[in-house]
Amino acid sequence: MKTVDAIYSRKSTRHYRNVRIERAVLQEILSAGIQAPSPKNDQPWKFLIVEEEEKKEAIANILEKQLEKVGERNAMTGIIRKDIESAFESVRILKEASTLIFVYLDTNIYDMHNDNLVWELNAADVECTHIMAIGAAIQNILLAATDKGIDSLW
């Protein structure tokens, strides 16, 4: 599949068949993520793969409890947020997918030279570029999954 074809055929899927992704295919998809551009090529991402049902259920339970707390707090103030309501649907999707790929910021890169040098930049300025790099890695992962015929959701 051409890259442009993957871009235009990629879609967000909210219902999954419980089909395992072969290890070699998953590795190819993650390798595409690693190829994303990053500031100074510091590759600030870490990937966590979750396939075990018990772990997915535990993660979903934690998320549901946090969402309930936010919902209770909002109810007390009279605020109704549709994004919180729709987040419960995301938790359902999380339980249904066979493979979860969590992408997170590796904060160890902030002292990668072990010299305790503190930049004058605000941490938010540095983190912003790293978060953009993580977004690029996620996009590569989604496009690689599309290329392999695997449905995904951001």
What role is predicted for each listed range?
Residues 1-27, 43:
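Specificity-determining recognition surfaces
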Residues 39-42, 93-95:
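Solvent-exposed alpha-helices and their adjacent loops that cap or buttress functional pockets
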Residues 40-51:
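Short loop-to-beta-strand entry elements in the cores of soluble alpha/beta enzymes
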Residues 49-133:
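Glycine/small-residue-rich phosphate/adenosyl-binding loop
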Residues 128-129, 148-154:
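GST superfamily/GST-like fold recognition
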